[in-house]
Amino acid sequence: MRDGRDTHLYKIPRHAPAAFPPCISPLRVYTTEIMSSLNGHSNGNGAIHKRVLKPGVWAPIPTFLDDREELDIATFRKHVVDLAKLGMQPVVCGSMGEAFHLTDNERVTLFKETRAALDEAGLFDTVIIAGTGANSTRATINLCHLAASSGADVAIVIPPGYFAGAMTPLALKTFFLEVQASSPIPVMLYNFPGAAGGIDLSSDLIEEIARKGSNICGVKLTCGAVGKLTRITAATATPAFADYPRKSDVAPEFLTLGGFADFLAPAVLGGRGHGAIMGLGNIYPRSLARLFELSYKIATDAQPSAQDLKKALELQDLVSGADASFTRAGIPGTKWYLKTHSGYPSARLRHPILEFTDEQGRALEKEEAVVKLMEVEKSLANNQ
């Protein structure tokens, strides 16, 4: 826990495990149902688009609901496409998406609608990361198969936290290795103690899982531990790690991603991180895409520009302040802000999480950091 943020974000109960699909052949699913993810996607004009997971920025997409708590597909599709056009890639059915409040059928619907919306917008190359976490190995593998057959390219899996006390390092390693071995798409580890019963994967355990699991494609660190990120990037950048190649062409390298926007530049510049998955990306997509662009350019340029560094650090200062505001506000604040400022029809959550009141929302939108970063966001929009 850092700055109390884990207690503010997502207090999500678990649902009962789904039944494992009978007699599913991973090879059959892999080759017949998601060939577009592996071998490219034709746009109808003969052009082939090959999707590849690579460094960048992602937003965990909220699951938009109407006032009866039913899926609002139209708003969901619009939001996914609007962000993707700005370089903010989608993570569907993650913590921000209230995944553990959704049925498996609802997750499948959102996976399918994401791929359909992106393809209809001509965004064939946009990689979809799908949340497939559940409270048993069997149920998690089931969701990985469902995600694969619904158009997702990568699964992101949180540790099963209901029986957190029984999750020894060996149990966690076994869980992730069994999931990745049976998943038809690459698997990203998701370390978020606040939403996994306090389970906090150590850097040593993450490195061991990555070495032994060739279908493990990366990790998202919502623990906020910059030192852990640095240790993982150092270990996976060594020549020795090259002896453990990744299994899938969709994810040819192991990516280490932050889980908050407030240390995006430090993670990329000082920690050799590959980007981040950030709830703040739903509100300020241009600003975060610009911050990553500057940071990655500085980190990879043989002669980095002092002017670029100055710009990156100034932007990071604003991002860190706004990230703190929206972290405190959590999912309710994000949905309220999107409804109020993007014209979305509802800010409804699936209860027991309660919606923001207008009083809370008005206080959020007036916070100095929120206002200042929105000025940058609008400036970037005007200059496009």
Task: State the predicted function of each range.
Residues 6-10:
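Intrinsic-disorder-associated, low-complexity terminal segments enriched in Asp/Asn/His/Tyr and depleted
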Residues 26, 30-31:
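Short, positively charged and aromatic/hydrophobic N-terminal segments
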Residues 37-200:
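Active-site beta->alpha loop and helix N-cap motifs at the rims of alpha/beta catalytic domains
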Residues 37-49, 53-64, 82-87, 269-273, ...:
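C-terminal alpha-helical cap/extension of soluble enzyme domains
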Residues 181-182, 193-328:
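Catalytic alpha/beta core domains of metabolic enzymes, predominantly
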